């Protein structure tokens, strides 16, 4: 009986093994193994026979198999087996974004630590290696599926302006695309830039529009990303990235009835995780990127990790992951997309056959595909495809077919299509290739990849971090464009706030004639969106193109100002009095942050006189969803002015002189000059959440009771008189010396003889913390590669700017004090108002060619090689200074701030404009101010950067003790601002808007709007409030984007007594829904029409519908 049981057990075990081995054979025909082992199928029957005679042989076979696997794993194979893949948990409640360190397969900061960054010649793939593949990897049941994707990259401004490109190139490309796609049903084409497509479509006749909709509907023409532009990812703010995406996708939905879910970013110079964050929350499923460091491409390719699930650095659950495809080679042009050998791939760019004026740099031209050569040409091309496929995990391969402004001529369409169709026909018909090739779209490729994933071919790794700073070869790091053309970068941030304010102010009401408001808002959104282009805000376009961007943004600023002042008058004038006049300017906007040139005389001066105009109404607007108290200033014609609210309650004010700085050619110094006709009045305004507050300025015949006057001290040798008109305090003079200043209960700041900050004392009983400001300059190399608009290639460490003994102006008042100094190329001002000091640099690099000016802060903070910079104003990421990389590689984009810290102290520099910066030594921060370069850096621009304009940079400096704060683990890749730093950043990017009433008397004026609005928690912001429907619609829809940042908790947590419910900000709500960030897809109908609370580091969108 025992023998029978043994025999029965043997039969059962043998049967199971037979089943498992059969399944193994079937699956092996369907999917390749991750390793390069070749199974010996001829021995399978012998093995089964042996198993039937006894299981004792099984153990020996398993030992042999393990030995073979060990041998394979020890081979010198550049492609290593994939790592274990972290699985994403289901979304749940709010994540702990501080204490829980996210677990991912690839963390970019850790990867940078491990990588050697050795630039080894890889052969035909210079930055890679000699790829080999198993010729038996594919079979009839497991073919290589190749999608050849025709595309044309159209820059909305670079060498030519938007309109020049459109007239010369883009309209011809799109016109021919319509014709050839309509006539050739198998042909496909993808398009990214909706700014161009919208321009083209609106010029079409009705029949052509119907044809266009037809080829979109049948999938021949596919829109990728669908943004207004393909945005820069380094300097852009996340709100502007979302703005241009919404603008483009809204147009596509309205006119084409499509919403892309696959993104295509082939040309931005480095990639930010902010992009997948916004895309994923806008309904995207997949994205593609190209420009990443060549060493990163090689490292990920070796691991077959070029396709991954890109997570946010705080995400420990996978809620934010977006599937991402990274292109493996040098460029997105045809020579670098079919495979690793550009000499071979160039032969399959049939526009380079000679008649088009293009050729292959490798001296082997393409040939027309014929019956005589199709076999040999197919062998050559399939070999490249299969080598490229080795870098990815599935049997699906993407082959982009295009370049800048391609497919312009009819003949180009024909020559590419006909030759590839001949290749496809031959390749697909030859069984030995085991390849199925066709024209396709990006979405078709991703669909096939995920189908292979579901079939069990592959699991994809998780990755977190960013892809800055980009290098395309050797030590050519693209960190110069973080600063190039800073005047226009500054303009971008000013316009960003104006668009937000104009949309918010106009969303509260709908009134007759609203169409004119809507037109101006659309104009402003589209011009700001256009500037997000990766040759716009980057400062990497030709001079006349930069001028065009500037003019467009100036018009956008005017459009916003028109909307804002009309809306303020509507909101603060009693309904019984209000009568709209859209051609009239009810208010003048006053902004000391702009113009970017810092020319103070361009600001409006309020003319007051007892007989002419004894008083003037001024209004402040707060775009933030909580009460704000902030100092504001105006220019007035008399120093004897008092301030009251509309109920005639006095407000404490301070008057100071208005100073301008001038070059003295004789003494070669920069010195101040006081105005004799205008003065600054400063007072603290209190403004409701997302609301308005009115104040009144009134002239007096003498010093008003509640107005104080600042004293002024000029520290210089050989003083001269400085008349200040009616100002009641004379200027005092003194020899250069160190000084200290404090306002109210704020910190005490100590300054050197040269007017530069030396130290900060946080409280009167605490020690001074050294914080030394310095100005330095970088030079350029005398030979070889040189710095230009894109590249930062310094000739060594920065050298000090010779300051000499500059003139220092000290202004001291109850509400505001300041120290100003005229330095070579910079008028540097430190302003104290009782909190974090404000730094203003009026930078004029003049004619200092091949010079890059930097501001450096030196402290005793023991920060080591760690510092933090922000990404697109959305998040802060940990950086590590790497000595194995050159100086320029350790420079990063600083869109809104950076900080260093040790166990006790943190120093944060917040910036009101995007620039480049770093921490090149422990305890240091530095940020570039401007760069003037005579040479082209050989990246296609064809010029240097010599069109510099004076620019006003504004910063806030926050020094604080953090020893009692809850901080992330040392292993966490994210950093978070404190409450004080967050508020300082908001004051830079979204200050109070200031309006001066244009008329002498305001009949029906109301003192406030928004006093009944709920005040949100300090970490929550209503980043977007926009009317989505035309004013004529019966049901009005308003969209909101809420963002909640995570603030580092220090001390007692803030109590939140009020909850912000955007669904009920406007009356008569009929419906409220949670949507994608672009407002185009409803995700959830909110029962009870109450918006749920937003989690830390989350962004959510809602649309409320209201009856008119």
Swiss-Prot record:
Protein encoded by which gene: alpha-Man-IIa
Family listed: Belongs to the glycosyl hydrolase 38 family.
Name used for this protein in its record: Alpha-mannosidase 2
Catalytic reaction annotation: N(4)-{beta-D-GlcNAc-(1->2)-alpha-D-Man-(1->3)-[alpha-D-Man-(1->3)-[alpha-D-Man-(1->6)]-alpha-D-Man-(1->6)]-beta-D-Man-(1->4)-beta-D-GlcNAc-(1->4)-beta-D-GlcNAc}-L-asparaginyl-[protein] + 2 H2O = 2 alpha-D-mannopyranose + an N(4)-{beta-D-GlcNAc-(1->2)-alpha-D-Man-(1->3)-[alpha-D-Man-(1->6)]-beta-D-Man-(1->4)-beta-D-GlcNAc-(1->4)-beta-D-GlcNAc}-L-asparaginyl-[protein]
Transmembrane stretches, start-end: 10-30
Function, as annotated: Catalyzes the first committed step in the biosynthesis of complex N-glycans. It controls conversion of high mannose to complex N-glycans; the final hydrolytic step in the N-glycan maturation pathway.
Pathway the protein acts in: Protein modification; protein glycosylation
Keywords: Disulfide bond, Glycosidase, Golgi apparatus, Hydrolase, Membrane, Metal-binding, Signal-anchor, Transmembrane, Transmembrane helix, Zinc
Cytoplasmic-side segments: 1-9
Gene3D superfamilies: 2.60.40.1360, Glycoside hydrolase 38, N terminal domain, Glycoside hydrolase family 38, central domain, Golgi alpha-mannosidase II, Golgi alpha-mannosidase II, domain 4
Disulfide bridge positions per record: none
């Amino acid at each position: 009986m025992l023998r029978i049981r043994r025999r029965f057990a043997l039969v059962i075990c043998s049967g199971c093994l037979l089943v498992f081995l059969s399944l193994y054979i079937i699956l092996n025909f369907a999917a390749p193994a991750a390793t390069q082992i070749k199974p010996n199928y001829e021995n399978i029957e012998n093995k089964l026979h042996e198993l039937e005679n006894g299981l004792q042989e099984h153990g020996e076979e398993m030992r042999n198999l393990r030995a073979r696997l060990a041998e394979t794993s020890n081979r010198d194979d550049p492609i290593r087996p994939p790592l274990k893949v972290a699985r994403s948990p289901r979304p749940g409640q709010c994540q702990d974004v501080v204490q829980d360190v996210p677990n991912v397969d690839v963390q970019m900061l850790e990867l940078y630590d491990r990588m050697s960054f050795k630039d080894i010649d890889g052969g035909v793939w210079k930055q890679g290696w000699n790829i080999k593949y198993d010729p038996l990897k594919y079979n009839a049941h497991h073919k290589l599926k190749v999608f050849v994707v025709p595309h044309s990259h159209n820059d909305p401004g670079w060498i030519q302006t938007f309109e020049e490109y459109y007239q010369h190139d883009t309209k011809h490309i799109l016109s021919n695309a319509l014709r050839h796609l309509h006539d050739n049903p198998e042909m496909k084409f993808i398009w990214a830039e909706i700014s161009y497509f919208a321009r083209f479509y609106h010029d079409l006749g009705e029949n052509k529009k119907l044809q266009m909709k037809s080829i979109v509907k049948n999938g021949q023409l596919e829109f990728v990303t669908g943004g207004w532009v393909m945005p820069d990812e380094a300097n852009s703010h996340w709100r502007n990235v979302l703005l241009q995406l919404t603008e483009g996708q809204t147009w596509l939905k309205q006119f084409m009835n499509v919403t892309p879910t696959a993104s295509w970013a082939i040309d931005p110079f480095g990639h930010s995780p902010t992009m997948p964050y916004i895309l994923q929350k806008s309904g995207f499923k997949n994205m593609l990127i190209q420009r990443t460091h060549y060493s990163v491409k090689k490292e990920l390719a070796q691991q077959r990790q070029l396709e991954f699930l890109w997570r946010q650095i705080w995400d420990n659950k996978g809620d934010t992951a977006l599937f991402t495809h990274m292109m493996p080679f040098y460029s997105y042009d045809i020579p670098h997309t079919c495979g690793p050998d550009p000499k071979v791939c160039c032969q399959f760019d049939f526009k380079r056959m000679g008649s088009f004026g293009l050729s292959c740099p490798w001296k082997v031209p393409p040939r027309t595909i014929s019956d005589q050569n199709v076999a040999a040409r197919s062998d050559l091309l399939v070999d490249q495809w299969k080598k490229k496929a080795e870098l990815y995990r599935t049997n699906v391969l993407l082959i982009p077919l295009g370049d800048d402004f391609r497919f312009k001529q009819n003949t180009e369409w024909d020559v590419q299509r006909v030759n590839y169709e001949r290749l496809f026909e031959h390749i697909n018909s030859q069984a030995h290739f085991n390849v199925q090739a066709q024209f396709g779209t990006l979405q078709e490729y991703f669909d096939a990849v995920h189908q292979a994933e579901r079939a069990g071919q592959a699991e994809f790794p998780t990755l977190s971090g960013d892809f800055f700073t980009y290098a395309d070869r050797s030590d050519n790091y693209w960190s110069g464009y973080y600063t190039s053309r800073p005047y226009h970068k500054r303009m971008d941030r000013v316009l960003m706030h104006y668009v937000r304010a104009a949309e918010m102010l106009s969303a509260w009401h709908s009134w007759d004639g609203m169409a004119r408001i809507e037109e101006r808002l659309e104009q402003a959104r589209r011009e700001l969106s256009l500037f997000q282009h990766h040759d716009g805000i980057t400062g990497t376009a030709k001079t006349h193109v930069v001028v065009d961007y500037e003019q467009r943004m100036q018009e956008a600023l005017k459009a916003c100002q028109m909307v804002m002042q009309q809306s303020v008058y509507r909101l603060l004038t009693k309904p019984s009095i209000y009568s709209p006049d859209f051609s009239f300017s009810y208010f003048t906007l006053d902004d000391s942050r702009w113009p970017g040139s810092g020319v103070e005389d361009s600001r409006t001066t309020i003319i007051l006189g007892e007989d002419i105009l004894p008083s003037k109404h001024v209004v402040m607007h707060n775009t933030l969803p909580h009460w704000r108290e902030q100092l504001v200033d105006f220019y007035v014609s008399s120093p004897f002015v008092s301030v009251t609210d509309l109920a005639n309650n006095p407000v404490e004010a301070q008057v100071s002189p208005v100073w301008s700085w001038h070059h003295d050619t004789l003494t070669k110094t920069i010195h101040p000059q006081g105005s004799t006709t205008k003065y600054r009045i400063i007072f603290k305004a209190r403004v409701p959440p997302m609301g308005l507050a009115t104040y009144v300025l009134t002239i007096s015949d003498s010093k008003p009771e509640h107005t104080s006057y600042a004293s002024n001290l000029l520290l210089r040798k050989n003083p001269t008189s400085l008349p200040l008109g009616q100002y009641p305090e004379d200027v005092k003079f003194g020899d250069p010396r160190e000084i200290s200043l404090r306002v109210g209960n704020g910190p005490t700041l100590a300054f050197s003889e040269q007017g530069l900050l030396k130290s900060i004392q946080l409280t009167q009983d605490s020690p001074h913390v050294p914080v030394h400001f310095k100005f330095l300059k970088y030079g350029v190399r005398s030979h070889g590669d040189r710095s230009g608009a894109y590249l930062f290639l310094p000739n060594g460490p920065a050298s000090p700017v010779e300051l000499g003994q500059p003139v220092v102006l000290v202004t001291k008042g109850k509400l505001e004090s300041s120290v100003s100094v005229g330095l070579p190329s910079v008028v540097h001002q430190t302003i104290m108002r009782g909190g974090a000091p404000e730094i203003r640099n009026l930078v004029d690099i003049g004619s200092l060619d091949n010079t890059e000016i930097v501001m450096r802060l030196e402290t005793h903070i023991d920060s080591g090689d760690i510092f933090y910079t922000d990404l697109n104003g959305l998040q802060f990421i940990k950086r590590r200074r790497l000595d194995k990389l050159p100086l320029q590689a350790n420079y990063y984009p600083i869109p809104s701030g950076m900080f260093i810290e040790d166990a006790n102290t943190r120093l944060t520099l917040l910036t009101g404009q995007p620039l480049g910066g770093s921490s090149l030594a422990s305890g240091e921060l530095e940020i570039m101010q401007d760069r003037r370069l005579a040479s082209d850096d050989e990246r296609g621009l064809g010029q240097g950067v010599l069109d510099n304009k004076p620019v006003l940079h504004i910063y806030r400096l926050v020094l604080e003790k953090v020893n009692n704060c809850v901080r992330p683990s040392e292993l966490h890749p994210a950093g978070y601002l404190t409450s004080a730093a967050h508020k300082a950043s908001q004051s830079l990017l979204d200050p109070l808007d200031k309006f001066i009433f244009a008329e002498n008397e305001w009949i029906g004026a109301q003192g406030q709007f928004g006093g009944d609005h709920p005040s949100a928690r300090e970490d929550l912001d209503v980043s977007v409030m926009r009317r989505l429907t035309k004013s004529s619609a019966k049901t009005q829809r308003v969209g909101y984007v809420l963002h909640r940042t995570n603030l580092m908790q220090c001390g007692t947590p803030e109590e939140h007594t009020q909850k912000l419910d955007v669904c009920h900000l406007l009356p008569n709500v009929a419906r409220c829904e949670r949507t994608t960030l672009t407002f185009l897809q409803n995700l959830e109908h909110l029962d009870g029409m109450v918006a749920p609370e937003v989690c830390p580091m989350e962004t959510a969108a809602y649309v409320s519908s209201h009856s008119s």
